[in-house]
Amino acid sequence: MEITERAFWTLIHGMGFGGLYLLACSGALVGLYQLTASSTSSESPHGQERFVRIYLIAMVVLAWAAVLIGAYVIYPWYRATPPPGAVDLSMFPQHLLMSSPAMIGWHSLGMEWKEHVAWFVPISITMVAFVFIRYGHDLRNHTQLRSAVLVFGLASFVAAGIAGFFGAEIDEHAPVRGGSTIQLGHREAK
């Protein structure tokens, strides 16, 4: 099996860091809610608190990795400019999308979302992690702050989900191609 270098980076960005982030979001929201909602102390609040801190830090790393790889590794390939008079735009995803009225929306809405709004994901989850690390289980005594943390966590999840949807659709219609070929596994000759 073969994959190009650019397709590999796209896979790492979307399915690796982005996909894991989306999977982790639901667990984080439930964990934050359970740890900060109850007025009674649980059996082991310090152990749970430590776990949620580590979990949130891992989410921060996933979110920043996805956004930074998307912005500084994949996006320049997406925006590559074709030479004058080029007819085959398959190596120039942005121009391929913009060349068709049926697909221009994937660039004008989808990629614009990914370029700008997707940055909200790591920023908001970093805020959530910072506030939780600062207040921990005591966050239950600060209802407005607790509500803000949960809302920002949910908003981060929604923004990441929409960015993931647009990324998958853009990759389906105009994938980032090129680069050296990576061999995955060995092929036997018959």
Language-model-detected regions and their locations in the chain:
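Polytopic transmembrane helical bundles with strong interfacial aromatic enrichment
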Residues: 1-190
